[in-house]
Amino acid sequence: MSGLPDYLRRPPRGMRDWLPPQFYALRHMEETLSKVAEAFGYRRVETPVVEHFEVLAKKAGQEVVNEIYYFKDKAGRDLGLRFDMTVPIARVISYNLSLPRPIRWYYFTKVFRYDEPQHGRYREFYQFGIELIGSASPRADAEVLQVFTQALDAVGARSYIVKINDRRVVDKLLERLGVSAYRDVIYRALDKKLKLSREEVIKLMAEGGVSLDTAERIYDIAEEMSIEEAVNVITKLDSGLGSFYNKLLKYLEAAVSLDKFRFDMSIVRGLDYYTGMVFEAFAGEYKLAVGGGGRYDDLLELYSGVKMPALGFAIGVERLMEAVGLEGVEKPLDYYIYIFDDDAYPYAVAIAKRLRSAGYSVVVELGEKNLKEVFEYILKIGTRYLIIIGKKELEKGVVKIRDLQRREEFEKPFSEFYGTT
């Protein structure tokens, strides 16, 4: 038999298999990030991978709608795979309106986007994120940013920058320049500022109807600045927004280092449901954003009919793993038990039971390898101790133990071994 052709032996394009070292690295990320969220009082949720297409498309921009994995089920219903967790969580809240607010939820789960696969961009990928629902206070914005930075710190991200913007600020600026009618065109062009050249971004705005002079001015205004500088600029544009950001600045100063933050008007995010503050993080030399989020005060009302302020963030787990250099985590076996014949098998099983109940991982040889082959095998898979039980050991009532790290060998009585639990 020839088996499967090569292309069927691989996962579908844009998806990946997780072998043990990579999966344990993923588990490490899950445990570390979950611990951060739990420490801030967030509780974990999960939703179906499959959603009604109408739910997914209700507030997503056209670019995102085009990336939804869409299909009809056998009953002819229009369904799709979730592209993030914010929309499904908004749906969940819509029929759980009696939940006490603010609601603090977090997730670590798979999402799907039918995007063009490339470096750092998969069609199936993991996201970690939080949603804080039911608060319009700037303290909520400060809390979400604090969780965001603490999550990045916890996994070892270094030299990262969190770039903040506010769609209301950009809207005020466009109003001043008389180009509010071209808001969507300008947003989409600014969103590509990190990927395209100055000329290409300006061209996108001009092709959308913005005059060349105004497009150049918008591009130049959308330069990075410190949070302190941004507060002054925002206050001149709108005193109400200025008051909000003065409070946010005060709360952030009390919780985190402001050196980690920059204000950048080109950060407008790719999803159309954000209504206020938006932000993205860039770690070291890694070119792509490892995560981001913002405020979406109108989204919950679309699903529940109830006005409910909310904000949150999502981190692309694979991107963050790549940015911090976490490629794999080896998880060596604690004990491998080798026996020379079936007479020793009951002893091997008894010892294995005791060790497993004490929390150790134990494999008992299946009887298909000789001792030389076992050595080759356990060195490849990674093993701490080899336990050998042969005829001599049975007669003496002991096991022979080889410490493969220290390269030591010693004997231990059966009775003493059982006493480990």
Curated annotation (Swiss-Prot):
Subcellular location: Cytoplasm
EC numbers for this chain: 6.1.1.21
GO BP, one annotated term: histidyl-tRNA aminoacylation
The keyword Cytoplasm is assigned to this record: yes
Molecular function GO terms recorded: ATP binding; histidine-tRNA ligase activity
Chemical reaction(s) catalysed: tRNA(His) + L-histidine + ATP = L-histidyl-tRNA(His) + AMP + diphosphate + H(+)
Top-level taxon: Archaea
Pfam families according to UniProt: HGTP_anticodon, tRNA-synt_His
Ranges in coiled-coil conformation: none
EC class of the enzyme, as a word: ligase
GO cellular component: cytoplasm
Keyword set, alphabetical order: Aminoacyl-tRNA synthetase, ATP-binding, Cytoplasm, Ligase, Nucleotide-binding, Protein biosynthesis
Protein's name in the database: Histidine--tRNA ligase
Originating species: Pyrobaculum islandicum (strain DSM 4184 / JCM 9189 / GEO3)
Name of the gene: hisS
